Regions:
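Hydrophobic/aromatic beta-strand patches that form the interior of the parallel beta-sheet core
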Residues: 18, 88, 121-123
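Alpha-helical scaffolding segments of alpha/beta enzyme cores, especially the outer helices
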Residues: 36, 68-82, 106-113
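Catalytic His-Asp segment of secreted/periplasmic serine-dependent ester chemistry enzymes
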Residues: 93-174
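Conserved SGNH/GDSL esterase-like catalytic core that processes O-acyl groups on lipids
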Residues: 1-72
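Active-site segments of SGNH/GDSL-like serine hydrolases
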Residues: 53-59, 76-106
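A short helix->loop->beta-strand "cap" motif at the edges of active sites that frequently abuts
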Residues: 48, 82-86, 120
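Generic structural signal for well-ordered alpha-helical scaffold segments
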Residues: 35-39, 77, 159, 163
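Class I S-adenosyl-L-methionine
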Residues: 2-6, 81, 112, 116
Length: 174
């Protein structure tokens, strides 16, 4: 998030971020823990917002279906909505595994639908990156993980596909 925050042009807005990421976390795990951890960082004196960055971890669980993943994300978003917390949902990124990507495309579409139905901003990182040469090269050289170029692409997508809308700020013109 450092790249996104560093490039955010909003001199009248003070932004603080607290990363609560857990590697390989499923949507079920996220649903169970997010409020307890995030609520300790929220304040009644500030405008509180939440970024949820989803992964492909749900694909590794045989017991988790797309419907279950949808429900888990819906529960997170519904709880946030009940507390008037705007959420920016960043979808999962593609892998180099074509079979996994086929399943991930379905999950991405489901997540987009859930966020859209609840009027939360969704940044689709999967669709623009799945065939992106630089993304794929970065994953190939980093044992399947994005490096500098990959993180730059994700930051660009976030900044240009919902970040300012979610913050309620005009998009910069330059």
């Amino acid at each position: 998030w450092g790249r996104v925050l560093a490039r955010t042009q909003a001199p009248d807005v003070e932004l603080e971020n607290y990363v609560l990421a857990v590697p390989h976390e499923t949507t079920e795990d996220l649903n169970e823990r997010w409020w307890g951890e995030a609520s300790r960082r929220f304040s009644e004196e500030t405008e509180n917002r939440l970024v949820v960055a989803l992964s492909d971890a749900d694909l590794d669980l045989e017991a988790t279906s797309t419907a279950r993943s949808r429900l888990n994300l819906a529960n997170v978003l519904d709880t946030a909505s009940q507390r008037n917390i705007p959420v920016l949902v960043v979808g999962p990124t593609p892998t180099l595994d074509e079979q996994r990507n086929a399943r991930l495309a379905e999950l991405n579409a489901a997540y987009l639908d859930v966020a859209d139905r609840r009027n939360h901003v969704y940044v689709d990182t999967f669709t623009p990156l799945v065939g992106h040469e630089q993304w794929r090269a970065d994953l190939a050289s980093g044992q399947g993980r994005p490096g500098q170029a990959g993180h730059g692409l994700i930051a660009w997508l976030v900044l240009h596909r919902g970040w300012y809308q979610w913050l309620g700020l005009p998009e910069p013109t330059a």
